[in-house]
């Protein structure tokens, strides 16, 4: 009995201790989790640099690391400031860090910096060097004056009858990036663009928008790796003037022009009554290349509205298109803004129904030009709607007297049918380019202008002061460039 009673007391005491350890004074349970294990230390096990096979001004640094999430390269040349690449993922334990924008013939050293939950760690130093430019690109010179906005200027150059180059040069005129594409037939320069997905697209082909010859756009990564080709679906030919990619994945869409050729009566514009000419179609393609939207100029436009004169010999049918679109962009509401050079017209088209929303300029102009001493534009290029809703375009000025090229910004009031000139820039001395050209409003508020037919680029402030200029020459002569377009970064899309 005594032993039994003693056991009961001991058990009660034990129960009291156990229960008391799991209760607080206010009756709420307190659970004390075990301390987390310390994060595992980030370790870089190897780094190695290699040349880029498509671009002597680029390199690649391979890194293998443990317990790291991401890595970047800090690098520089002797006596120069340290630069940094964007970070890349190390989720798989290894990655290749692209290094872009190197200077020809310069040696660099750098360290890989890896990041993880335990902090960051740096590798031993690794060396690499930029090579020489290809011989064809060594014929290119860019002379600059002034100080331009940060970033690079893109230009597409067909050189030596053998290679089409996508080139980026900095504000000092040094070529800092390129990608070459070999060809065996004559090439026309076309649209070169950095898309919002960070990749670049370049037109490869001989057409200028009317010839019965094949062509396509090639999409390639900043490293130069070719990703895919994009073309108008059969039976259309692919036009060289514009490609814009929007969205991603299943929502990705490609916006471009195609064209076909038909026998037409050109007598209303002084040509033969039966000649084969080209007419264009606005296309929106799905990721698989099928058409989601088509809008044919043959159905909506008239040959008799062709106001830019055809070539001296209208029977040279391989060179004729009556509409000649050269810009395709999206308005703030998602509808299309199209520039038709040969019609002297900018058109807004409903991107779903295909209905014409308005027509500015040309024979079917629906607007009154206000405060514009030249009462409109002609042979225009690069029409874009700005974030404030204004229309910015490059006015080639073929129909001005005297002929002069300028950049114009209009405030549009579709309800009142007015286009009010709110800003323009005319170069001093005057520059006239009958063909090609580009204009961009930069993040700084400055405007970048590409006088492509003259191989000249200008950046101007809002008050019209020239901040920077560049002259691009090949073998000492001005080079024809379809567009001279600014980008903010070689690695990823960034507003310039």
Segments the model singles out, each with a brief description of its role:
Residues 55-61:
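Structural beta-strand segments of beta-rich domains
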Residues 62-64, 89, 98-101, 127-129:
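Generic structural detector for well-ordered beta-strands
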Residues 65-70:
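Short proline/glycine-enriched turn/loop motifs at strand-loop junctions of beta-rich domains
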Residues 12-16:
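Hydrophobic helical h-region of N-terminal Sec-dependent signal peptides
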Residues 40-43, 50-55, 107, 113-496:
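Histidine-/acidic-rich catalytic cores in large beta-rich domains
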């Amino acid at each position: 009995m005594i032993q039994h009673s003693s056991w009961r007391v001991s058990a009660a005491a034990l129960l009291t201790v156990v229960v008391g350890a799991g209760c607080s004074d206010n009756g709420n349970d307190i659970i004390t989790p075990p301390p987390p294990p310390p994060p595992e230390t980030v370790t870089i096990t190897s780094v190695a640099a290699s040349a880029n096979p498509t671009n002597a001004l680029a390199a690649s640094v391979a890194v293998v690391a443990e317990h790291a999430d991401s890595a970047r390269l800090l690098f520089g040349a002797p006596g120069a400031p340290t630069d940094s690449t964007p970070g890349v993922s190390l989720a798989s334990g290894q990655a290749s860090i692209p290094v872009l924008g190197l200077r020809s013939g310069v040696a660099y050293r750098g360290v890989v910096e890896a990041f993880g939950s335990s902090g960051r760690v740096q590798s031993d130093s690794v060396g690499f060097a930029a090579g020489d430019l290809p011989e064809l690109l060594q014929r290119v010179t860019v002379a600059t004056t002034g100080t331009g906005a940060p970033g690079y200027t893109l230009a597409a150059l067909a050189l030596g009858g053998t290679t089409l180059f996508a080139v980026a040069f900095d504000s000092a005129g040094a070529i800092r990036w390129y990608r070459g594409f070999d060809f065996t037939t004559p090439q026309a320069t076309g649209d070169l663009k950095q898309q919002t997905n960070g990749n670049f697209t370049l037109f490869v082909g001989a057409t200028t928008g009317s010839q019965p010859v094949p062509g396509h756009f090639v999409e390639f990564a900043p490293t130069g790796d070719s990703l895919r080709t994009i073309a108008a679906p059969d039976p259309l030919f692919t036009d060289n003037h514009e490609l814009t990619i929007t969205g991603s994945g299943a929502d990705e869409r490609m916006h471009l022009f195609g064209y076909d050729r038909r026998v037409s009566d050109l007598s209303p514009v002084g040509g033969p009554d039966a000649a084969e000419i080209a007419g264009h179609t606005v296309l929106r393609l799905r990721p698989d290349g099928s058409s989601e939207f088509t809008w044919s100029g043959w159905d909506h436009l008239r040959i008799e509205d062709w106001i830019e004169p055809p070539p001296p010999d209208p029977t040279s049918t391989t060179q004729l298109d009556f509409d000649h679109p050269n810009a395709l962009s999206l308005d703030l509401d998602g509808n299309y803004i199209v520039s038709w050079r040969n019609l002297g017209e900018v058109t807004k088209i409903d991107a779903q129904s295909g209905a014409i929303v308005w027509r500015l300029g040309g024979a079917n102009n629906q607007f009154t030009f206000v405060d514009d001493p030249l009462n409109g534009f002609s042979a225009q290029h690069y029409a874009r709607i700005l974030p404030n809703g204004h229309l910015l375009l490059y006015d080639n000025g073929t129909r001005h007297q005297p002929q002069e090229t300028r950049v114009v910004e209009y405030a549009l009031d579709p309800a009142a049918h007015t286009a009010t000139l709110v800003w323009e820039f005319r170069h001093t001395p005057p520059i006239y380019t009958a063909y090609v050209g580009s204009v961009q409003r930069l993040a700084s508020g400055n405007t970048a202008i590409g006088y492509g037919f003259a191989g000249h680029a200008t950046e101007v402030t809002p008050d019209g002061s020239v901040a920077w200029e560049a002259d691009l020459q090949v073998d000492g002569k001005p080079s024809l460039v379809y567009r001279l377009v600014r980008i903010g970064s070689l690695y990823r899309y960034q507003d310039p």
